Structures are given as C-alpha cells and as structure tokens.
Amino acid sequence: MKKKRFNSDIEVQAFARHICMSAHKMRRVIDQIRGRSYEQTLMILELMPYRASYPIFRLIYSAAANASKTMGSKEADSLISKAEVNEGTFIKKLKPRARGRSYPIKKPTCHIIIVLKDKSKKPKSFLERKYGFVDKYMIGK
C-alpha cells in the first residue's frame, strides 16, 4: 500500500480514534462539511441535530488550534481539504440473560481524519522543502 504524501507547509492533520459510534452515522455528517471553510463548518455542526456532530466539532476545533500553533496561520483562512471516516474495532460486551446464559453485544467504533488546508499560503516546491531555499542555479535554464 502506498503512503499518501502530506504537505506539512500548508496542511495540518487531526485524528480521533475509537469513537463509540458507527462509521455510517459519522459519514452522514462528514459528507456535509467536506470542502467547506472553517467558519462555515462550525456553524453547520452547531446546528446539526445529530449526535455525531459533537466529536467532529471538537476535532475540527483541535485541528484549527494545531494550524494556528504550528504554522501561525489564522483559523478563518482554513479549508477542510480532507475528511475521512474509517471503521474501527468492535467493543465486545456480554449481556446477562435468563438461566445463566449471556448474549454478546458488539458496539462499533470509528476513526476520523481531518486535514485542514491554509487558503492563503502557497505550497513550497521540492527544492524549497529539501534545502530550505531555491537558488537560480538549482533550477537550471
């Protein structure tokens, strides 16, 4: 499996793992916010009546705080470039029943990945990321 490239100059990731909710219910909310701006996303999530919106709200708020801390960018300039929900493990419990028997209960969990992109910054070239600068002799004419 190939690893996807991550441009740390203009993007910030945030992960939430083992959230006790099915991935299908989370995707219903995530599909509404993918590709929107940070401020618009927070307004949408506050007004949604679903239980899944609160963990996503907290995660996006955390990702914006990471962006302002690491890159020094404004939260208003952020855009949700990637929002992904994957299935996690099942929490397994036993429910006691009649005559000393027990029934298994499987509660699904999910993992969320949010990537915020800064609209105001431009991505750096390969040479700028590798050497920290670009000289006119490096480019070649």
From Swiss-Prot:
This is Large ribosomal subunit protein uL22c. It comes from Chloranthus spicatus (Chulantree). CDD domains: Ribosomal_L22 (cd00336). One of its GO terms (biological process) is translation. Belongs to the universal ribosomal protein uL22 family. The keyword Calcium does not apply. The gene is rpl22. Part of the 50S ribosomal subunit. It is found in: Plastid, Chloroplast. Its main location: plastid. The keyword Ribosomal protein applies. GO terms for cellular component: chloroplast; large ribosomal subunit. Keywords: Chloroplast, Plastid, Ribonucleoprotein, Ribosomal protein, RNA-binding, rRNA-binding. It comes from the Eukaryota. This protein binds specifically to 23S rRNA. It holds the Pfam family Ribosomal_L22. GO terms for molecular function: rRNA binding; structural constituent of ribosome.
